């Protein structure tokens, strides 16, 4: 296990509205929105946080409203609908945007984000914030599993972590 200690500036976060999702999971303090990739896979496309003092666990498997299971293999949000899951250029940030909804300043930050072993790709700008607006994911710790084989450009741009663990 490799652990990186990062400097954290003033933490901030989000809460927002998402459209075009296929299914969602409500948890105490946060809601996860998913988009179906194919018959067996889904990606986390948005994370809305209601309680900033929480531990966010992204599941390895999600169910749709009919009970069908989908393995969560990606984290990311398309910039607009003209792009699709299969055509993502991981070196280019123009196709994607952050998984966070509307962002606002918050005096606290979330405890942790745990990404499951099922995730293989983290899209460009997935956990990014904005230097111009001064926001980014404020998080005490993030765990990135060893199964992640691709991390897109700017995936953690302007994010604020105290600790990142990469097994």
Where are the language model's segments positioned?
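Signature of short aromatic-glycine-proline-rich micro-motifs recurring in repeat-based ectodomains
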Residues: 76-79
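Compositionally biased non-globular segments, especially hydrophobic aliphatic-rich helices
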Residues: 8-12, 129, 158
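Consensus positions within tandem repeat domains that build extended binding/scaffold surfaces
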Residues: 123-126, 152-155
């Amino acid at each position: 296990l490799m652990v990186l200690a990062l400097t954290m500036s003033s933490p901030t976060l989000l809460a927002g509205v998402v459209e075009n999702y296929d299914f969602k999971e409500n948890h105490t303090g946060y809601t996860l929105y998913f988009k179906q990739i194919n018959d067996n896979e889904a990606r986390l496309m948005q994370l809305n946080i209601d309680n900033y003092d929480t531990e966010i666990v992204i599941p390895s498997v999600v169910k749709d409203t009919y009970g069908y299971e989908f393995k969560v293999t990606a984290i990311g949000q398309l910039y607009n609908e003209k792009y699709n899951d299969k055509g993502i250029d991981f070196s280019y940030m123009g196709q994607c945007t952050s998984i966070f909804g509307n962002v606002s300043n918050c005096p606290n930050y979330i405890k942790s984000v745990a990404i499951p072993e099922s995730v293989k790709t983290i899209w460009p700008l997935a956990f990014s914030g904005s230097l111009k607006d001064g926001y980014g994911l404020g998080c005490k710790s993030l765990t990135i599993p060893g199964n992640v084989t691709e991390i897109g450009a700017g995936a953690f741009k302007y994010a604020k972590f105290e600790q990142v663990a990469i097994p």
